[in-house]
């Protein structure tokens, strides 16, 4: 999708999106190109792999990326890591310049508990550990990963599980709850996930965002952004791979 193709609705949607460049080994040139594009378009954040920090080649100290916030990930994409390993990964990202970290929660906790709707105490304990590793003012996002509970290979996450994760995030001091990255857009899936999470965190300072990574080149991407935003998503993620190669420039 080129700048010439963006109508007013698409341009307004740019303020609600973030760009993801989670290629295992993005080059410095790719990273710089995506951050610069985000800055030009008024996009608020760019996701980068933990190994990309500290980010180099984007300006002087204190004003490296302008208003663009740099986000990293930890425990990505499954969450099947010891919490201390995940916390260490998150802490290193912040120590090396990440403004925000999205941490994938342990699926054993997400789908734990006697009724498999989430082990609230275990989730709170996990998020408290992560919060200590990602101290304020850094932003801690907690996400559901791609691994489902027993008997759930794919498909939407049960509402009760989403509600438990949201409750834990509020109780343990997370800033954002992120839906699963493999939750497909469409009625009864990604939008419904966002609605459930938004209702569960209502009245708190915790916000909700979609974990589904949409294609920046998809003509319908901004329609999906609008639907997810209407459902309660504070931000939506678009894949920045094509931008880093200059195909949309």
Language model: regions and residue ranges:
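Alpha/beta enzyme core
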Residues: 9-41, 53-55, 60-72, 76-78, ...
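Periplasmic-binding protein-like
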Residues: 44-45
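Intrinsically disordered, low-complexity repeat/linker tracts enriched for polar/charged residues
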Residues: 1-2, 6, 10
